């Protein structure tokens, strides 16, 4: 960010950082269908400022001076086409103003910008407005959807000087000392110079409706001033929504609160509102979204749950839910934590640990109820947040069974299935829950490792999330049935009858095939640990599997890729003894050993390709293929 300072050293002109500049261009030239969200964002910022002041005033009451009641005021000036949002919250110093309004710390900004471009392109084709801004909530900058000039005047609580920030949204902003006549005694004033097509936001009835619908739940009173100098009218009483009985709260109120606290524009898939009494007394209002935020996998993001103590905001960085539930949004209000607890000491509090345990259990149980009651709605939750659920299988041993019950998997049977459904459909003599892990769902579906299982109607879990290869090693079983990779060790398929009973009568493996397998084992001894006849293959000639002990094929690839293993172990080459290709190669005898060695190594490369790998030596693979094709052509013309 570059800056220019006036000769008196007070006024300063700066250039927005690159991401902000792009974002502002999108706001200025916005085609968003719901521009009302700018007001929700400004009110949300104002409410946060009031709550932060209330927290700081616990240790420094002098910050409140003679203005202890928090308030947000919206003032209309229709004649000048201006809209002003005032709060008497914590305010900003000059440096805080530059940092808060000139940069974006949010890790998902780039992703938001890219997604918004996609949405704009789609909406242009369809002739509709897009609503991605409501989903991601870019806060203050949304003001430029309705204003061609924005001025922010702020005075930090306890400070003497006030500062003015101004920008037309075209790439630069200025920071200057504010005149005392226009500065609030404490807090922040945001003045919007509305564009011609946004002058409707000076209509009192329209503003009242927007505020009541979108922000009537904020825990700070909101007043409306119809024109400068007029008496204020209260349009929201500041009663925190979570303190009201559930029976007194309508669905629309819950949705509006969710949109404010989550920064999403959709409706929640699940709302969890309860009051706990007993050893710990607290109220929780939590939401499970339908869509995923871009920053869910960022390690430095703020916590998704706001912590209050007796309606005083404490922090949004408390560890109130385990990481595998980081997609949940909402508030928790404790009656037991001391108001003067420091943010540093919160994490050490046994009260907080008890609250975390309670709300974690409640969220999991409510998700289980949703899954039972509305499989379609729960399916959307799983599609959005399934990878995070799976993290909990190896992170939270005490909740493993509950999390496994919530998991849904794509299988060789088709649609999403629960493990309970899977176990209920086990075949006679089936003792394991079989799975195939990999990076590509389509490749998994076509894997030769599945052939023997399909022939017997045995369902296999198809696991294509990166986390899958890890949690299966941490979850020894489900309802007494162990998890077993179809790419590792023996299959135990011999005891399970085939669907086609006529296929059970298979010809004995010939002596020549047995000898050929021994030849393969000798020829490939430096590349594979063993060569053996396969039960799992019915249509393909070969496949690679891992030894019974150690990681399966996919996990081994991941560990080698991240440097946890120095190299891959030798795989086992399984051969389908009844495949026509194997029978033909076995019938060659010892007449052309060089050709047989070429075919042996070609079979191994074939297995590697089917396993998602490349031949170990591309040049030699090409030469070997040419020799085999030449031999085949020579034989066909003989």
Curated annotation (Swiss-Prot):
UniProt entry keywords in alphabetical sequence: ATP-binding, Chaperone, Cytoplasm, Nucleotide-binding, Stress response
Matching InterPro entries: HATPase_C_sf, Heat_shock_protein_90_CS, HSP90_C, Hsp90_fam, Hsp90_N, Ribosomal_Su5_D2-typ_SF
Annotated GO MF terms: ATP binding; ATP hydrolysis activity; ATP-dependent protein folding chaperone; unfolded protein binding
Sequence segments annotated as region (C): 558-638
Entries under SMART domains matching the protein: HATPase_c
Gene3D superfamilies from the UniProt entry: 3.30.230.80, 3.40.50.11260, Heat shock protein 90, C-terminal domain, Histidine kinase-like ATPase, C-terminal domain
Region (A): 1-343
Subcellular location: Cytoplasm
GO CC entries: cytoplasm
CDD domains, sorted: HATPase_Hsp90-like (cd16927)
Keyword field contains ATP-binding: yes
Cystines in this chain: none
Stretches the record annotates as B: 344-557
One protein family per Pfam: HATPase_c_3
Function: Molecular chaperone. Has ATPase activity.
Family membership noted in the UniProt record: Belongs to the heat shock protein 90 family.
Record text on subunit structure and interactions: Homodimer.
Protein name stated in the entry: Chaperone protein HtpG
Organism classification: Bacteria, Pseudomonadati, Pseudomonadota, Alphaproteobacteria, Hyphomicrobiales
Annotated gene: htpG
């Amino acid at each position: 960010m570059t800056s220019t300072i006036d000769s008196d050293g007070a006024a300063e002109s700066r250039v927005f950082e690159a991401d902000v500049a792009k974002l502002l261009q999108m706001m200025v030239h916005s085609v968003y269908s719901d521009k009302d969200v700018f007001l929700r964002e400004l009110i949300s910022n104002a409410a946060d400022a009031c709550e932060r002041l209330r927290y700081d005033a616990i240790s420094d009451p002098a910050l409140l001076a003679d203005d202890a009641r928090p308030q947000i005021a919206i003032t209309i000036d229709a004649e000048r086409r201006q809209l002003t949002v005032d709060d008497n919250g914590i305010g900003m110093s000059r440096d805080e103003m530059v940092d808060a309004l000139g940069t974006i710390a949010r890790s998902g900004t780039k992703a938001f910008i890219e997604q918004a471009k996609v949405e704009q392109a789609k909406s242009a084709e369809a002739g509709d407005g897009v609503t991605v801004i409501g989903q991601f909530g870019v806060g203050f900058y949304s003001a430029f959807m309705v204003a061609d000039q924005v001025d922010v005047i702020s005075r930090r609580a306890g400070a003497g000087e006030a500062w003015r920030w101004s920008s037309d949204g075209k790439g630069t902003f200025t920071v200057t000392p504010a005149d005392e006549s226009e500065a609030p005694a404490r807090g922040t004033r945001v003045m919007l110079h509305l564009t011609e097509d946004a002058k409707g936001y000076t209509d009192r009835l329209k503003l009242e409706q927007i505020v009541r619908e979108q922000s009537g739940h904020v825990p700070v009173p909101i007043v409306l001033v119809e024109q400068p100098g007029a008496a204020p009218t209260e349009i929201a009483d500041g009663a925190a929504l979570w303190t009201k009985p559930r029976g007194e709260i309508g669905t629309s109120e819950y949705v509006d609160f969710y949109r404010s606290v989550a920064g999403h524009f959709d409706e929640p898939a699940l709302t969890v509102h309860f009051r706990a009494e007993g050893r710990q007394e607290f109220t929780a209002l939590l939401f499970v979204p339908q869509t995923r935020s871009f920053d869910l996998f960022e390690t430095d993001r703020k916590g998704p749950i706001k912590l209050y103590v007796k309606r005083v905001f404490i922090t949004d960085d408390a560890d109130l839910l385990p990481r595998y539930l980081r997609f949940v949004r909402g508030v928790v209000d404790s009656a037991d934590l001391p108001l003067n607890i420091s943010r540093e000491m919160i994490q050490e509090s046994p009260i907080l640990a008890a609250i975390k345990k309670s709300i974690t259990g409640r969220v999991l149980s409510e998700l289980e109820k949703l899954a039972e009651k509305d499989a379609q709605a729960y399916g959307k939750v799983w599609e959005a947040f399934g990878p995070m659920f799976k993290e909990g299988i190896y992170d939270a041993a005490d909740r493993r069974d509950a999390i496994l019950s919530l998991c849904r998997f794509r299988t060789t049977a088709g649609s999403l299935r629960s493990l309970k459904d899977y176990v209920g459909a086990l075949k006679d003599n089936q003792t394991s829950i079989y799975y195939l892990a990999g990076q590509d769902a389509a490749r998994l579906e076509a894997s030769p490792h599945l052939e023997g299982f399909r022939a017997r109607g045995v369902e296999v879990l198809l696991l294509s999330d990166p986390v899958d290869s890890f949690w299966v090693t941490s979850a020894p079983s489900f309802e007494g049935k162990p998890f077993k990779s179809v790419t590792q060790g023996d299959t135990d398929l011999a005891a399970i009858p085939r669907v086609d009973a006529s296929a059970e009568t298979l010809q004995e493996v010939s002596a020549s095939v047995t000898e050929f397998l021994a030849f393969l084992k000798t020829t490939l001894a430096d590349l594979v640990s063993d060569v053996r006849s396969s039960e799992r293959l019915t249509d393909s000639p070969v496949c690679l599997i891992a030894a019974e002990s150690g990681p399966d094929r996919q996990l081994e690839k991941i560990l080698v890729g991240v440097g946890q293993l120095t190299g891959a172990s030798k795989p086992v080459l399984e051969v389908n003894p009844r495949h026509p290709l194997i029978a033909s190669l076995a019938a060659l005898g010892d007449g052309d050993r060089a050709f047989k060695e070429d075919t042996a190594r070609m079979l191994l490369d074939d297995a590697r390709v089917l396993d998602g790998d490349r031949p170990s030596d591309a040049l030699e693979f090409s030469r070997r293929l040419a020799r085999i094709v030449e031999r085949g052509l020579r034989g066909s013309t003989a």
